[in-house]
Structure formats: structure tokens, C-alpha cells
């Protein structure tokens, strides 16, 4: 199968990878968690062990460093936070144009749910997954699932 036989999404996915991800306290800039792993791989459930103190923060700054061989007209993410398979929150992020053969860093701020909606870490631990769909416009590039453990 040659590169002409691949769909647009498959072609982008083949040359796309996450190099690292960093979570910071949005108020102080202090690094809470960092992982040098490609969380975009679709055929495996990834795991992330994040400090429990993240649940007490007003907002978290997420930094994703990624590389792509193919250009993307409108790179965007749809994220769903699921508790035992049920959607608790959904977020939409848009980066826009990404050049071919580039490495990029994308920073976004995620605000915490109201305190009245928060659940204790012992209830959340291992029961929360983040499902991320990566798109170029409406073309799905890849979909990944990360299960969260609070340490």
C-alpha cells in the first residue's frame, strides 16, 4: 500500500507524534507533571500518574509538544473526561494552521470544575479516562485514551 492509498487522516497520523506533555499550576507556573511519551497512539489505553494536588488547583496549564510531517490547515482537539465511561466534561481546543515538517508547542489553560462538582481522589482514581480526538478541520487524525491515577 503506497502513500497515495492512505486516507488524509491516516497520512497525517503516520507522521504525527506527541514528544512530551507538561501540566503546570496555571497560577504559579510550577510543573506538576511531565511525561515524555507519545499519548497519541490510538491502539492502546495509556496511563498517567498525576499528583493528587492537581485536583485542588484553580486551573492547569497544559503544554503539548508535537511533531508532524504533514501540514494541517486547522489542528484541533476534542477532549472528553469520562468517569466510569460517562462523560463528566468536554473541552474543545483549536490551534489552527501547523506547517509541514515542524515541531510545535501548544499551551492551553483548563479551569477546574466548581468545587461543588468535585469528587474525592479515592473515588476518581483509576475510574477517569480522558478521550482525546485529534483533528485537522473535520478529518480525524487519531483518537487516544488516557486513564488517570492520582498519586
Curated annotation (Swiss-Prot):
Keywords: cGMP, Cytoplasm, Nucleus. Pfam families: GMP_PDE_delta. GO terms for cellular component: cytoplasm; nucleus. GO terms for biological process: sensory perception of light stimulus. Signal peptide: none annotated. It is found in: Nucleus; Cytoplasm. Its main location: nucleus. InterPro entries: Ig_E-set, PDED_dom, PDED_dom_sf, Rhodop-sen_GMP-Pdiesterase_dsu. Belongs to the PDE6D/unc-119 family. PANTHER family: RETINAL ROD RHODOPSIN-SENSITIVE CGMP 3',5'-CYCLIC PHOSPHODIESTERASE DELTA-SUBUNIT, RETINAL ROD RHODOPSIN-SENSITIVE CGMP 3',5'-CYCLIC PHOSPHODIESTERASE SUBUNIT DELTA. Interacts with Pde6. This is Probable cGMP 3',5'-cyclic phosphodiesterase subunit delta. It comes from Drosophila virilis (Fruit fly). The gene is PrBP.
Amino acid at each position: 500500500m503506497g502513500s497515495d492509498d492512505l486516507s488524509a487522516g491516516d497520512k497525517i497520523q503516520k507522521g504525527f507524534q506527541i514528544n512530551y506533555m507538561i501540566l503546570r499550576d496555571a497560577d504559579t507556573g510550577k510543573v506538576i507533571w511531565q511525561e515524555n511519551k507519545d499519548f497519541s497512539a490510538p491502539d492502546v489505553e495509556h496511563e498517567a500518574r498525576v499528583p493528587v494536588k492537581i485536583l485542588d488547583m484553580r486551573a492547569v496549564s497544559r503544554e503539548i509538544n508535537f511533531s508532524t510531517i504533514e501540514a494541517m490547515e486547522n489542528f484541533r482537539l476534542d477532549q472528553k473526561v469520562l468517569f466510569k465511561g460517562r462523560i463528566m466534561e468536554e473541552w474543545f481546543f483549536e490551534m489552527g494552521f501547523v506547517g509541514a515538517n515542524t515541531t510545535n508547542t501548544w499551551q492551553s489553560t483548563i479551569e477546574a470544575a466548581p468545587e461543588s462538582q468535585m469528587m474525592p481522589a479515592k473515588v476518581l482514581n483509576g475510574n477517569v479516562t480522558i478521550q482525546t480526538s485529534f483533528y485537522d478541520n473535520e478529518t480525524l487524525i487519531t483518537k487516544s485514551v488516557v486513564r488517570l491515577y492520582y498519586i
